[in-house]
Amino acid sequence: MTKVKIITDSTARLTPEEVAQYDISVVPLTVMIDGTVYHDGVSITPSEFIEKMAASKNLPTTSQPSLGAFTEVYETVPEDVEVLSLHLTHHLSGTVQAAEQAARLVPHDIVVCDSNYIDRALAAQVLVAGRMAQAGATRDEILAE
């Protein structure tokens, strides 16, 4: 049986419990507030983001994860494990394109999927994939769902 690793980005807003339950890896987007750079969900929490945004002189900006951030996560996956990398819609970010570029840089079997959603709608897809992977489904079976 081939194991499947699920990877997503921080816009899915997964809880620490969800990440742990399904062994999901999360690649953080970058947030800049008043010149300070934060890694979403790593160096700034959603509640801290709201507080800082309210006190900010300018609206925050975000940036897709770097190729290095993706390759760093992809390289932690054993080569005999298939990867399904699910991300926020390409209509809002270049995250899918960055994930695709990074996937070509590592010797792993990676399929990058544009969820066409963001936030908890993305999370719903990621959690279904995580449950199916945990139950032993193949990547093709997960994608067919």
How should these model regions be labeled?
Residues 84, 92-144:
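Active-site histidine-anchored catalytic micro-motif
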Residues 41, 58, 62-66, 87, ...:
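Catalytic cores of large soluble enzymes that bind and process phosphate-bearing ligands
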Residues 8, 85-89:
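Short beta-strand segments
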Residues 69-73, 98:
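Well-ordered alpha-helical segments embedded in enzymatic catalytic cores
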Residues 1, 21, 78, 105-107:
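Short, well-ordered coil/turn elements that cap or connect secondary structure elements
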Residues 5-69:
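N-terminal glycine-rich anion-binding loop in soluble enzyme alpha/beta folds
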